[in-house]
Amino acid sequence: METLKKLEEGRSRAEQILNQAYADVNRQHASLEETEFHRLKIQFDIIHFQAFSAMISILKAEPHTFARKVALKEILHMIYEYKGTVTQHHIWRLCQLGEYKGAYDTVTRLRELVRDFRDEFKSLDEYKTLRDKATGHYDQDISVQIAAIERIDEDAALAHALAFAEFQGRFAVLLREIGRATPGT
C-alpha cells in the first residue's frame, strides 16, 4: 500500500497546485500571452489532478475484476481525449508562446517530447470503441458497453497510464520553463 500512499500524497499536491492554477487563471494578466499560458496550465493541472484520482481508484479496486476494468476505462478515456487536445492544440500553442518568450531550447525539447511519445499516442487509438461505447458516450445497448469494458487488458491499460504519467512529468518541466521565461531574455 506504499504506492497508494504516494498517490494520495501526489493527489493532495496536485489539488493544491490546481487550486493555485485556478486563482492564477482568474487574476489580471499583463498580456494575452500570459493569460493564454495560464489557461493552458490549468488544463494540464486539471488532467494531472484527475490522473491521480483515477489511479487511486484503480489501485483500490480488486485486480482482475470488472470493477477494476471500470476504473481503468476512466483513465483510458481521459488519456484518449487529452492526447488529441494536447497534440493538436496545446503543444502547438506552447511552442508559439515559448518562441515568443525566447525559450527556444525548451520549444525544441517540447517537440522532441511529442516525437518520443508519438507511437504511444497512436496506440491509444485502439480505445476508440471503448470511448464511443462505454466512456462518456454510452451505447444504448448495455451489452455492448459491458463487452467493451471486458476487453480491457489490465496490463496494457496500466502501461498506458504509466506512459502517460511519464509524458505528464516531462511536460510539466517544459511547461514550467515556458511559464518562467520572459520575452527578450
Regions found by a protein language model. Name each.
Residues 139:
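Carbohydrate-active enzymes and regulators
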Residues 129-136:
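Long, charged low-complexity segments
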Residues 1-126, 146-185:
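Amphipathic alpha-helical interface segments
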